[in-house]
Amino acid sequence: MDKELALNFLKEIFEKVPGDQWISIFAIDRTVEPSARASQKILWNRVDELEELVDRLEPLSATHCIWYGIATRRARLEKGRGGAEDCALIPALWLDLDIAGPGHKTAENLPPTMEDTLKLLDEYNPPTDFIVSTGGGVQPYWLLDEPVPVSIVLPDLDNWYYTWQKILKEHGWHLDNVFDPARILRVPGTFNRKTSNAIPVTIV
């Protein structure tokens, strides 16, 4: 695991979020049958404990796919990651764009290559702040000037989806609706272990 990459990324994402907010981590052990409850782990850390959080992720990264919740949670939950009603602040807008290849559930048309996907993003204004390569696509980010309460940003998330759905449709490509506040996204510095060939999750 690239701990420095993971830590620097999370610091950028949550830089303006109050330290007492909670970050949820979801991990799946790819050495265990995915349907088994034992394959799933949920971790919690406060925003002001990012170094500790990354230390906790390091041993998991050898066998797990690891995601984090883009929205902070108001409190640490006893069970599960929670839903929209548990989310507090959104620090950035995001996309989750699959690129054609193995491992995707959809039969819809997807951008054929990384080059095509990056060209599409490059044509959009404002430009991205980060583009994370997930091992099966990309997750671009646009940081907000200030974290926005989920109750306020919900209509904007719907509009964001419709905007990008239209853009991709013009190219003949499909976009999943992955813009719920409780959305989880991959942590750079970890690995996509969906197949036997582990692929580093990096920043383009």
Language model feature labels by segment:
Residues 138-139, 194:
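Flexible loop/turn segments at secondary-structure boundaries
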Residues 171-204:
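Catalytic "initiation/cleavage/transfer" segments centered on a nucleophilic residue
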Residues 1-136, 143-166:
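Signature for HUH/AEP ssDNA processing cores
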